[in-house]
C-alpha cells in the first residue's frame, strides 16, 4: 500500500504501485473468495508463526491485516475469556467476514475489530502483549514499513513480542522469491505483496 512521496526505497526491493485506496478496493472485491485463493497455501506458515507468538490466557493480542478472521479466531481461543484480541484491517468487507466467523464460533465477545490504517493504530501506548502480522508487512511500500513498526513498538508493552510472517528476501528464497517478484512486477494488481527484508526491518 503506497501513499508516500518519499524516494528513499531500499535497493533490490520492488516498489508498491497500488495506493491504499486501490488496495482497499481490491480486498473488498475479493473478500468473498479470499479463503479459496489463500487459506490452504498460507496455513502452514501461519501456524508456525502462531507457535512462535505463544499466546497465553488473559493476554491482549493485536493482529494487523486480519483478513477473513481465521487467525483472530485462533488467537481468541488462546487468550480465553479473560483476554482480548484486537484486529485492524483496511478492508470493510474483510472485516464483515471476520465478524461473521467470530460470531459463528462464539468468540466475538473476545474481539475488537477496527477498519483502518496500521500507520496510525487506534490503540493506547503499552496496551498489547503481542502483535501478529501474516503476509501484511510486505503490502506497505518501503518508506512506510518503519512507520508501521514504530506504531507497533508504541502499542506493545516494553516486554511485548511481535511475530511477522512475510515473504522475505533473507534466507534461501530462490525460485519462489523470483516468482513473487516477477508476478508483482508484471501483474501488481494480482500480486500486491512482494518480497522484503523483513528481518532487517525488525532489527
Regions found by a protein language model. Give the residues of each.
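Class I SAM-dependent methyltransferase SAM/SAH-binding core
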Residues: 62-120
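Conserved alpha-helix/loop element of class I SAM-dependent methyltransferases that forms part
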Residues: 40-57
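Helix-to-beta-strand junctions that scaffold the AdoMet/dcAdoMet cofactor pocket
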Residues: 80, 140-141, 156-157
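Short alpha-helix
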Residues: 190-203
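A short acidic, Gly/Pro-enriched loop at the edge of an enzyme's catalytic core
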Residues: 119-131
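A short glycine-rich, Lys/Arg-flanked "PGG" loop and its adjoining helix->strand segment in the class I
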Residues: 146-158
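Conserved beta-strand signature within the Rossmann-like core of class I S-adenosyl-L-methionine
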Residues: 159-166
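N-terminal, positively charged/glycine-rich alpha-helical extensions of SAM-dependent methyltransferases
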Residues: 1-31
Amino acid at each position: 500500500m503506497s501513499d508516500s512521496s518519499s524516494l528513499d526505497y531500499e535497493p533490490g526491493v520492488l516498489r508498491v504501485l497500488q495506493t491504499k485506496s486501490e488496495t482497499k478496493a481490491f480486498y473488498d472485491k475479493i473478500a468473498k473468495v479470499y479463503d479459496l485463493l489463500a487459506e490452504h497455501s498460507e496455513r502452514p506458515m501461519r501456524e508456525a508463526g502462531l507457535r512462535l507468538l505463544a499466546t497465553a490466557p488473559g493476554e491482549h493480542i493485536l493482529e494487523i491485516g486480519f483478513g477473513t478472521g481465521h487467525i483472530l479466531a485462533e488467537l481468541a481461543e488462546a487468550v480465553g475469556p479473560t483476554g482480548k484480541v484486537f484486529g485492524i484491517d483496511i478492508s470493510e468487507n474483510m472485516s464483515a467476514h471476520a465478524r461473521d466467523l467470530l460470531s459463528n464460533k462464539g468468540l466475538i465477545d473476545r474481539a475488537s475489530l477496527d477498519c483502518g490504517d496500521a500507520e496510525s493504530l487506534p490503540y493506547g501506548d503499552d496496551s498489547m502483549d503481542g502483535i501478529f502480522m501474516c503476509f501484511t508487512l510486505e503490502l506497505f511500500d518501503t518508506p512506510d514499513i518503519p512507520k508501521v513498526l514504530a506504531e507497533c513498538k508504541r502499542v506493545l508493552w516494553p516486554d511485548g513480542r511481535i511475530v511477522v510472517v512475510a515473504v522475505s528476501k533473507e534466507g534461501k528464497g530462490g525460485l519462489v522469491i523470483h516468482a513473487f517478484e516477477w508476478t508483482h512486477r508484471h501483474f501488481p494488481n494480482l500480486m500486491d505483496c512482494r518480497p522484503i527484508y523483513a528481518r532487517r526491518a525488525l532489527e
